[in-house]
Swiss-Prot record:
One of its GO terms (molecular function) is DNA binding. InterPro entries: RKD-like, RWP-RK_dom. Residues 249-269 have a biased composition (Low complexity). The gene is RKD1. Residues 175-216 form a coiled coil. This is Protein RKD1. It comes from Arabidopsis thaliana (Mouse-ear cress). Putative transcription factor.
Length: 269
């Protein structure tokens, strides 16, 4: 019975020796697979083998993570606001913005005012004539610019345009002082040398008028000598008046007047 069953099994399924083997057909299969799919070797290199132990990790390899609580964003914002103070910071920010706006407004107004003043002063300085400026020769140039309501630089520029190289304030004041000294000498001398002193005064007045018209004109040599003689006479009179008696002071004044008179006579010549 057993032999019969074995015989049927061998007839149906074949013997073990004649069993189908993949090894016998491996060369054919590999040749056909290479012809059908030329990238088969590349896939073998890139894809890992299914039997590798690193392909899938076991569940036991994962560590148990602790339970994490969700982060409260509201509480974090509340902490930040409590530290820095949201209300005070916004107030400071608004104050800073308002101060910055005020400063920008003041700077813009100052710039606009400066432009308007420069434009107005430039227009005024261009309309100034030499006759108008000559009325302010007897005061310093800074005061003249203030009186004319223009800048000092613009006044100097306008003077250069009109041919006035140097402001004649000191020159005219020196000449005015010389005229006053000659007038005092005329009072001291009396009627003796009245004509000569009057002629000297007339010449000095003419020279003053010419300097007003031509500010760059220099003094004459006779005017310089007369000015120096009057200065020396006044200095001697002041020095001896406090040191000596009235008799000596009168004599010294007479000598000083005589020296100045000699200079006046030289001025007439």
């Amino acid at each position: 019975m057993k032999s019969f069953c074995k015989l049927e099994y061998d007839q149906v399924f074949g013997k073990e020796n004649n069993s189908f083997s993949f090894l016998n057909h491996s060369s054919l299969y590999s040749h056909q697979s290479e012809l059908a799919n030329p990238f088969f070797e590349l896939e073998d290199e890139m894809l890992p083998s299914a039997t590798s132990s690193n392909c899938f990790t076991s569940a036991s390899s994962f560590l148990a993570l602790p339970d994490l609580e969700p982060i409260s964003i509201v509480s974090h914002e509340a902490d930040i606001l409590s530290v820095y103070g949201s209300a005070s910071w916004t107030a400071e920010e608004t104050m800073f913005v308002s101060d910055f706006a005020k400063k920008s407004e003041t700077t813009t107004t100052k710039k606009r005012r400066c432009r308007e003043e420069c434009f107005s002063s430039c227009s005024v300085s261009k309309t100034l004539s030499k006759e108008t400026i000559s009325l302010y020769f007897y005061m310093p140039i800074t005061q003249a610019a203030r009186e004319l309501n223009i800048g000092l630089t613009l006044l100097k520029k306008r003077c250069r345009e009109l041919g006035i190289k140097r402001w004649p304030h000191r020159k005219l004041m020196s000449l005015q002082k010389l005229i006053s000294n000659v007038k005092e000498l005329e009072k001291m001398e009396g009627e003796e040398n009245e004509d000569k002193l009057r002629n000297a005064l007339e010449k000095l007045e003419k020279e003053k008028k010419t300097i007003e018209k031509l500010p760059d004109l220099k003094f004459e040599d006779k005017t310089k000598r007369l000015r120096q003689a009057c200065f020396k006479a006044n200095h001697k009179r002041k020095r001896r008046s406090g040191m000596s008696t009235p008799i000596t002071s009168s004599s010294s004044s007479a000598s000083a007047s005589s020296s100045s008179y000699s200079s006046v006579s030289g001025f007439e010549r």
